[in-house]
Amino acid sequence: MENQPKLNSSKEVIAFLAERFPQCFSAEGEARPLKIGIFQDLVERVEGEMNLSKTQLRSALRLYTSSWRYLYGVKPGATRVDLDGNPCGELDEQHVEHARKQLEEAKARVQAQRAEQQAKKREAAAAAGEKEDAPRRERKPRPAPRRKETTPRTPRAEKPAAKAPRAPREEQHTPVSDISALTVGQSLKVKAGNNAMDATVLEVTKDGVRVQLNSGMSLIVRAEHLVF
């Protein structure tokens, strides 16, 4: 027992469980919904194997059941299974709806992160372009040799220097200081990098504000990312 290798991460624990209970867990592809109370079954069957502790098993289960492929498998008509793959009852509507919302929120977070990364890339590219387009220092022209003239020449009027175009005024936004003052249906904006996306308030929760973007996607946003 002392010579058993130790599993250091939740992913390694999941891989071990998929090998130990292939009819219940899977390392890839769509996952099957697990029996309610399966944690206690795991403790009784594998605690001590591979030096596994209850904390490691609990963390691995949490990671497994919050993964996209597991949430995809929680759908109407699906059946829960125990460690040996035996059916343990059909999923109820409440659990299916909860999984759908979790998956939707996870996708929204990924999309918001990608939008923020794209905004930063565009900002960096624009800054690099401005440096390349900066005008080089003009050389002063050499004065032309004077010619002897019998009549005085009238000096040409110098053209006024062209005014540099004004930089576009950056749109100003007011931060949302108190989310409890927000109302359902109120319009505001969600900050993503230097951009602000139009959104509508759907719900005010303890974790933040659920909003809907113009694209139809809904997500929960913290107060510091909301502006008017």
UniProtKB/Swiss-Prot annotation:
Region of interest (Disordered), residue spans: 105-178
Annotated InterPro entries: ProQ, ProQ/FinO, ProQ/FinO_sf, ProQ_C
Keywords, alphabetical: Chaperone, Cytoplasm, RNA-binding
Biased composition (Basic and acidic residues): 117-136, 146-173
Cytoplasm recorded as keyword: yes
Location of the protein in the cell: Cytoplasm
Coiled-coil blocks: none
GO molecular function: RNA strand annealing activity; RNA strand-exchange activity
GO cellular component: cytosol
Domain of life: Bacteria
Protein's UniProt keywords contain RNA-binding: yes
GO biological process: post-transcriptional regulation of gene expression
Protein's UniProt name: RNA chaperone ProQ
Protein's organism: Citrobacter koseri (strain ATCC BAA-895 / CDC 4225-83 / SGSC4696)
Lineage per the UniProt record: Bacteria, Pseudomonadati, Pseudomonadota, Gammaproteobacteria, Enterobacterales
Encoding gene per record: proQ
